[in-house]
């Protein structure tokens, strides 16, 4: 499909720089496909679900992936900003660096600017390799848990570029940019639909008879990238590691068999569920990387309802929601949201989408 079909203009004032407070006060646009767009709030979510439905949340935890440092391996130093984007092994990470032109393979970076130190001393990394678009492979002096602790001590929350370009990350972001379900470290971006949940909302959902299941998908920086090719056929999707346990698969399959609906909280949960689903709709255990790319024409196997934030133009995520609820439906929904002052992106409002009827069998 042509990429420009997924383009739209978003006024800068619609981009949220802070989350709603309290979190349940964020707005929620309900899109059922009947032509009626309903303006609600996150606090209304239990009213749209039925006993036996299963919410599926992503329990990944965002690491402090933004690091400041300096190149120390030459006669003159140079300031370096690095964003960790993918763990390669116990001591190596793939990272995006700025300015990339200041680094060569073999250079050493010492992280810990702005008065920050880690308990084990300074954190050095060697540039093992350098890619064409600013990505580098960093080999750190620490390994495993020691490296994780050093990154936590020295790093900052890796805010998305549309927020970081307007203001620096602060201590409040360390709380705001983490869901209440966060348990397993590895993400460099938050599964943002989960940011809307509070213990009180979870209690109301359980009282309604709605189940809650956890999966893990470590969100990568590629989630923010626009599709740059003119046709979606030419886009190469980024890979992210995910896990869905046998116990969770069994609980979801039992709920489906009893008439319950699968409600994905966020596109990350959606992508993992669809990656784990078999052709007959059975959800299988899963532990691997997925690079599933969902565009209109895809036949959904697992998910019935999707709760998600509002996404970037030309992004793979806007393509995903258009596949789920219909392109024309989502174009109308986004136009309504923009006109009505909904807040977009990571700290913004949400929409609740019901899957469009589609009997076509189209493999991903």
Swiss-Prot record:
<keyword id="KW-0808">Transferase</keyword>
<dbReference type="InterPro" id="IPR042118">
    <property type="entry name" value="QueA_dom1"/>
</dbReference>
<dbReference type="GO" id="GO:0008616">
    <property type="term" value="P:queuosine biosynthetic process"/>
</dbReference>
<dbReference type="Pfam" id="PF02547">
    <property type="entry name" value="Queuosine_synth"/>
</dbReference>
<comment type="similarity">
    <text>Belongs to the QueA family.</text>
</comment>
<keyword id="KW-0949">S-adenosyl-L-methionine</keyword>
<dbReference type="InterPro" id="IPR003699">
    <property type="entry name" value="QueA"/>
</dbReference>
<dbReference type="GO" id="GO:0002099">
    <property type="term" value="P:tRNA wobble guanine modification"/>
</dbReference>
<dbReference type="GO" id="GO:0005737">
    <property type="term" value="C:cytoplasm"/>
</dbReference>
<protein>
    <recommendedName>
        <fullName>S-adenosylmethionine:tRNA ribosyltransferase-isomerase</fullName>
        <ecNumber>2.4.99.17</ecNumber>
    </recommendedName>
</protein>
<comment type="function">
    <text>Transfers and isomerizes the ribose moiety from AdoMet to the 7-aminomethyl group of 7-deazaguanine (preQ1-tRNA) to give epoxyqueuosine (oQ-tRNA).</text>
</comment>
<dbReference type="GO" id="GO:0051075">
    <property type="term" value="F:S-adenosylmethionine:tRNA ribosyltransferase-isomerase activity"/>
</dbReference>
<comment type="subunit">
    <text>Monomer.</text>
</comment>
<comment type="pathway">
    <text>tRNA modification; tRNA-queuosine biosynthesis.</text>
</comment>
<keyword id="KW-0671">Queuosine biosynthesis</keyword>
<dbReference type="InterPro" id="IPR036100">
    <property type="entry name" value="QueA_sf"/>
</dbReference>
<dbReference type="InterPro" id="IPR042119">
    <property type="entry name" value="QueA_dom2"/>
</dbReference>
<keyword id="KW-0963">Cytoplasm</keyword>
């Amino acid at each position: 499909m042509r990429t420009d079909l997924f383009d739209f203009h978003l006024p800068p004032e619609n981009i949220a720089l802070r989350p709603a407070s309290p979190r349940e006060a964020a707005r929620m646009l309900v899109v059922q496909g009947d032509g009626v767009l309903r303006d609600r709030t996150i606090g209304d979510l239990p009213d749209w679900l039925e006993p036996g439905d299963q919410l599926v949340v992503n329990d990944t935890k965002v690491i402090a992936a933004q690091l400041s440092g300096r190149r120390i391996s030459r006669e003159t130093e140079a300031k370096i900003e690095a964003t960790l984007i993918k763990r390669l092994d116990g001591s190596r990470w793939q990272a995006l660096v700025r300015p990339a032109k200041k680094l060569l393979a073999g250079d050493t970076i010492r992280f810990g600017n702005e008065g920050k130190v880690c308990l084990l001393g300074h954190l050095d990394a060697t540039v093992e390799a350098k890619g064409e678009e600013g990505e580098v492979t960093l080999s750190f002096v620490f390994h495993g848990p020691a490296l994780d602790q050093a990154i936590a001590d020295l790093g900052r929350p890796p805010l998305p570029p549309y927020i970081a370009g307007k203001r620096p990350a602060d201590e409040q972001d360390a709380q705001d940019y983490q869901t209440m379900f966060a348990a397993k470290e590895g993400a460099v971006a938050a599964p943002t639909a989960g940011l809307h949940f509070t213990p009180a909302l979870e209690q109301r959902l359980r009282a309604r008879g709605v189940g809650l299941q956890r999966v893990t998908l470590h969100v990568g920086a590629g989630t923010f990238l626009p599709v740059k090719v003119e046709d979606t056929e030419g886009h190469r999707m980024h890979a992210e590691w995910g896990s869905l346990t046998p116990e969770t698969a069994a609980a979801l399959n039992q709920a489906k068999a009893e008439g319950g609906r699968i409600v994905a909280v966020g596109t990350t949960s959606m992508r993992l569920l669809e990656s784990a689903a078999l052709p007959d709709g059975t959800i299988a255990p899963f532990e691997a990387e997925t690079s599933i790319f969902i565009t209109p024409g895809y036949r959904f196997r697992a998910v019935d309802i999707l709760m998600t934030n509002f996404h970037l133009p030309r992004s793979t995520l806007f393509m995903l929601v258009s596949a789920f609820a219909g392109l024309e439906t989502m174009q109308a929904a986004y136009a309504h949201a923009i006109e009505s002052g909904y807040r977009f992106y990571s700290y913004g409002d949400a929409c609740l989408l019901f899957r469009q009827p589609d009997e076509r069998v189209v493999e991903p």
